[in-house]
UniProtKB/Swiss-Prot annotation:
Any Pfam family hit: RuBisCO_large
Protein name: Ribulose bisphosphate carboxylase large chain 3
Annotated disulfide bonds: none
Superkingdom: Bacteria
Organism: Bradyrhizobium sp. (strain BTAi1 / ATCC BAA-1182)
Family: Belongs to the RuBisCO large chain family. Type I subfamily.
Miscellaneous comment text of the record: The basic functional RuBisCO is composed of a large chain homodimer in a 'head-to-tail' conformation. In form I RuBisCO this homodimer is arranged in a barrel-like tetramer with the small subunits forming a tetrameric 'cap' on each end of the 'barrel'.
Active site: 177, 295
Record-listed N6-carboxylysine modification sites: 203
Manner of cofactor binding, per the entry note: Binds 1 Mg(2+) ion per subunit.
Xref: NCBIfam families: PRK04208.1
Length: 486
């Protein structure tokens, strides 16, 4: 689209007044991105009557060096280098009026190792730009030179499995329910019953911090007492995600230190604390040999809508840089948003050393992760034992499966719910290891396991008809098609 540069050169470039962005050097269709460039892919929807190339050039300008008028101080900088360059504009398939804008940024525009600084440019003022109806950051290519300035996940999948001594299967967890209102003693009872019944982890929910019905210190004490008792009863290493999210960094450090003193192996934070706080807690976790779980609370306010916001695949990349060990990444079959192909893309970003471009998964760029640890994805929200074959097929084994209601809602009690999930998982892993087609035989495998496990039989009966089959609001723009044979 309009593959000729129209940049104004020489003294005319710096005449006072207003100049189109595409003439100021922010539209360079002949530009070849360098290996060290940060590349962003935006979905741009211009206002009616706005030239698409001008709109995309404006995104490049407003997310780097431009303002609304020519300023003479540009001549005091290496302006040609520091201007972001939109080098490619394409219509979005199936979305009339929207365009993909590929924009390259020189690496020197960004402070090393700072998500806050990166986002201040890439998703800063530009999202409020009036000539745009909508703007969405779809994907980013982060150069190795930039990736290496971040610590990455504090623990990583391999070391986490070694600490837990659990291999070859997904980890099992449950979020304590109800998420609000329990006393510390009753909260601890839920943790104990779930861990004793067969789960590896329990977790706080995103909004349980330190409220009048249960202060944080009380919760930590009862939870760790439950963990220690469950470990003694089962002979397995157990854990519970203690949410240290708080009003200030000082409060969060205090809570994390107390969790460490009590012997916890894992702490939890919420996405809403912000990028700087997340990176700060990740550095603390690495120094203190603690697994760091991130709940993506709040993400759907800007990731769910297809036309405007930030794709979760970008958030996943930022969080892998930032250094968390766990991140909620969708279930496909549960109650929360999650197109199968899009969700696979999220999981690939978390778990691969190198992400090749996979347009069918919404991944637009090759991404090298250098030596950064892998990030453990977490599946939670509306899943139950009857879906175990689907979960294993869709999400693989390096994942934490969180059955909250699917554990605590069991008619025979919490421990029975945990046992049902553990037996269902073990049966499916055994079938997979035997080479069986566990995806198609899944219901049969579960039914056979239920013959000798009353809790599983009851779980399959009570939740057999529960599905969440709604159309996804965020699916890939490119769908693979079969080429007919000649």
């Amino acid at each position: 689209m309009n593959d000729q540069s129209i940049t104004v050169r020489g003294k005319d470039r710096y005449k006072s007044g207003v100049m189109e962005y595409k003439k100021m050097g922010y539209w360079e269709p002949s530009y070849q991105p360098k290996d060290t460039d940060v590349i962003a892919l935006f979905r741009v929807t211009p206002q009616d009557g706005v030239d698409p190339v001008e709109a995309c050039a404006a995104v490049a300008g407003e997310s780097s060096t431009a303002t609304w008028t020519v300023v003479w101080t540009d001549r005091l900088t290496a302006a040609e280098k520091y201007r972001a360059k939109c080098y490619r504009v394409e219509p979005v398939p199936g979305s009339p009026g929207s365009y993909f804008a590929y924009i390259a940024y020189d690496l020197d525009l960004f402070e090393p190792g700072s998500i806050a600084n990166l986002t201040a440019s890439i998703i800063g003022n530009v999202f409020g730009f009036k000539p745009l109806k909508a703007l969405r950051l779809e994907d980013m290519r982060l150069p190795v030179a930039y990736v290496k300035t971040f610590q990455g996940p504090a623990t990583g999948i391999v070391v986490e499995r070694e600490r837990l001594d659990k291999f070859g299967r997904p980890l099992l967890g449950a979020t304590v329910k109800p998420k609000l209102g329990l006393s510390g003693r009753n909260y601890g009872r839920v943790v104990y019953e779930a861990l004793k019944g067969g789960l590896d982890f329990t977790k706080d929910d995103e909004n349980i911090n330190s409220q009048p019905f249960m202060h944080w210190r009380e919760r930590f004490l009862y939870c760790m007492e439950a963990v220690n008792k469950a470990q003694a009863a089962t002979g397995e290493i157990k854990g519970t995600y203690l949410n240290v999210t708080a009003a200030t960094m000082e409060d969060m450090y205090e809570r994390a230190e107390f969790a460490k003193e009590l012997g916890s192996t894992i702490i939890m934070i919420d996405l809403v604390i912000g990028y700087t706080a997340i990176q700060s807690m990740a550095k603390w976790a690495r120094r203190n040999d603690m697994i760091l779980h991130l709940h993506r609370a709040g993400h759907s306010t800007y990731t769910r809508q297809r036309a405007h916001g930030v794709s979760f695949r970008v958030i996943a990349k930022w969080m892998r840089l930032a250094g968390v060990d766990h991140i909620h990444a969708g279930t496909v079959v549960g109650k929360l948003e999650g197109d199968p192909n899009t969700t696979r893309g999220y999981y690939d970003i978390c778990r691969e050393d190198f992400n090749p471009m996979r347009l069918e998964h919404g991944v637009f760029f090759d991404q090298h992760w250098a030596s950064l640890n892998k990030l453990m994805p977490v599946a939670s929200g509306g899943i139950h034992a009857g879906q175990m074959h689907q979960l294993l097929d869709l999400l693989g084994e390096d994942v934490v499966l969180q059955f909250g209601g699917g554990t605590i809602g069991h008619p025979r009690g919490i421990a029975a719910g945990a046992t049902a999930n553990r037996v269902a998982l073990e049966a499916m892993i055994l079938a997979r290891n035997e080479g069986r087609d566990y995806v198609h035989e899944g219901p049969e495998i579960l039914a056979k396991a239920a013959q000798t496990c009353t809790p599983l039989r009851e779980a399959l009966e009570i939740w057999k008809d529960v599905t969440f089959n709604y159309e996804s609001t965020d699916s890939p723009d490119f769908v693979p098609t079969v080429t007919p044979a000649a």
